[in-house]
Amino acid sequence: MNILVVDDEMDIRTLFEQKFRKEIKDKVFTFQFAHSGEAALELLQTEGSSIVLILSDINMPGMSGIELLKRVRIVHPSAPPKVFMITAYGDKENRESASTLGADDFLTKPIDFASLKEKLQ
């Protein structure tokens, strides 16, 4: 399973990689990382359908996670990757916007990696 993690903070991307390797320990997962919504779209164009899950922060400079979700749903209407939105706070407005656009799930920081692993099974 090819997973794209999108977050503007390098520390968060590094933490995701370390936690996945340590706590999930599953060889079927491969990871790619993008520092922005724009970089994520570029990766999606080159990788095509190999990315099956996007874990995207909602609040990023430039293109937000909400805008990324919107564009992913437009570019991949028939077989879109799953998109889990990540936020440091569970504000209702962002959740409603993301739900309306087709977000598959929400994760609140700090991430519970055991729970995430269950969702990925």
Give, region by region, the residue ranges found by the protein language model:
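Two-component/phosphorelay signaling modules centered on CheY-like receiver
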Residues: 10-32
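Helix N-cap/capping motif at the beta->alpha junctions
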Residues: 33-42, 65
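Short amphipathic alpha-helix used as the core "switch/output" element in two-component signaling
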Residues: 42, 66-79
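Active-site beta3 strand of CheY-like receiver
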Residues: 48-55
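Receiver (REC) domain active-site loop signature in two-component systems and cognate sites
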Residues: 60
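Alpha4 helix (beta4-alpha4-beta5 surface) of REC/receiver domains from two-component response regulators
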Residues: 67, 80, 90-105, 115-118
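Hydrophobic/aromatic residues positioned on beta-strands within the core alpha/beta folds
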Residues: 84-86
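A Lys-centered signature of the CheY-like receiver
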Residues: 109
